[in-house]
């Protein structure tokens, strides 16, 4: 099949994939609960002749095609939605209150199923496995699937993610680290409660927390190599009980992102030292808990430059 024939083949079922994507968008499912999505995927793949295995990594689906003894190339597709209320007013908006495909996984599923239709007709001399992964948004599904053997036998694995900042028909590629490693940061600031009119008799945990929030951002710019950037964002803060009482305790929850593996491996220790120091400067104590969630995506140079042919879909 030459390129023109390939494009005609894609065009022949493009409307089918668009309708499929919109159906998935209307019926989103949260991480680990992708049961109906998995049924839809499995049925589609079985109908076009793929060997399908279900309930891999809980709600995941994997499908094989071609001569698996000649090496297997994998394509990974995520399929969970987010706990977000959709307000787009699209004709195919989410029909599930508080759940939305806001990260593009509905598109990823459609892309994966479209690839499955094409591969069936290419007569490749190696095997192909498409991995439909659950629970990407809670950074758990990949581990579940690996534990259940989803990657066994793979020689290479490919992936894709839609990116709204790129024009339609454009593919963004980069050698080495692309998306950053992710970690979860929990900080408990402990002070000493007291009356708001007599702050000198207590230790204001909210003041200490504000020092931590602003101070850690300043520390990043002065103490870490700017060529290996680190992003720290506190997304949740909780503390205090009354408007006129010093807060005894404040909890901060945030995320840490970094593309350099060595920096990421050491960032937990760095955060503990610097956050503790900032809290201590206010007379407070800090308990710092850092958890690595996912490593950075590292693009292999040998697979990267393969002359992709983008299509407007």
Name each region found by the language model.
Residues 263-280:
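Oxyanion-binding "anion nests"
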Residues 245-260, 264-267:
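A conserved active-site cap/scaffold subdomain adjacent to cofactor or substrate pockets
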Residues 34, 220-231, 278-290:
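Flexible, glycine/charged-enriched surface loops at secondary-structure junctions
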Residues 24, 75, 105, 145, ...:
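Divalent metal-coordination and catalytic microenvironments
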Residues 62, 82-84, 89-100, 106-107, ...:
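Histidine/acidic-residue-rich, glycine-tolerant segments that coordinate divalent metal ions
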Residues 60-62, 233-237, 286-304:
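A short beta-alpha structural unit
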Residues 2-101, 106, 110, 114-125:
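Acidic/His- and Gly-rich active-site-bordering loop/insert found
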Residues 305-313:
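Single conserved hydrophobic/aromatic residue that forms the stacking wall/gate
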């Amino acid at each position: 099949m030459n390129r023109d024939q390939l494009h005609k083949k894609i065009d022949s079922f493009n409307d089918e994939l668009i309708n499929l994507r919109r159906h998935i968008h209307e019926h989103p499912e949260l991480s680990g609960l992708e049961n109906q999505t998995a049924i839809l995927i499995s049925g589609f793949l079985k109908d076009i002749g793929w060997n399908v295995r279900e309930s891999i990594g809980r709600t995941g689906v994997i499908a094989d095609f071609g001569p698996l003894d000649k090496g297997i190339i994998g394509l990974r597709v995520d399929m969970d939605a987010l706990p977000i209320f959709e307000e787009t007013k699209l004709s195919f908006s989410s029909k599930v209150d508080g759940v939305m495909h806001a990260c593009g996984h509905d598109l990823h599923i459609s892309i994966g199923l479209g690839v499955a239709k094409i591969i069936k007709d290419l007569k490749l001399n190696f095997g192909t496995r498409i991995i439909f992964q659950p629970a990407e948004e809670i950074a758990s599904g990949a581990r579940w699937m690996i534990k259940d053997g989803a990657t066994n036998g793979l020689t290479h694995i490919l992936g894709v993610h839609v990116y709204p900042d790129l024009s339609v028909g454009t593919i963004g590629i980069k050698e080495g680290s692309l998306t950053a490693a992710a970690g979860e940061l929990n900080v408990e600031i402990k002070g000493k409660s007291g009356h708001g009119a007599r702050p000198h008799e207590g230790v204001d945990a909210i003041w200490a927390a504000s020092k931590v929030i602003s101070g850690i951002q300043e520390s990043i710019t002065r103490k870490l190599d700017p060529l290996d950037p680190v992003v720290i964002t506190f997304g949740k803060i909780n503390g205090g009980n009354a408007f006129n009482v010093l807060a005894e305790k404040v909890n901060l929850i945030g995320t840490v992102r970094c593309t350099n593996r060595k920096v990421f491996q050491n960032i937990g220790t760095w955060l503990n030292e610097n956050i503790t120091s900032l809290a201590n400067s206010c007379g407070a104590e800090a308990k710092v808990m850092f958890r690595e969630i996912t490593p950075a995506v590292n693009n292999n140079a040998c697979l990267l430059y393969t002359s992709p042919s983008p299509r407007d879909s």
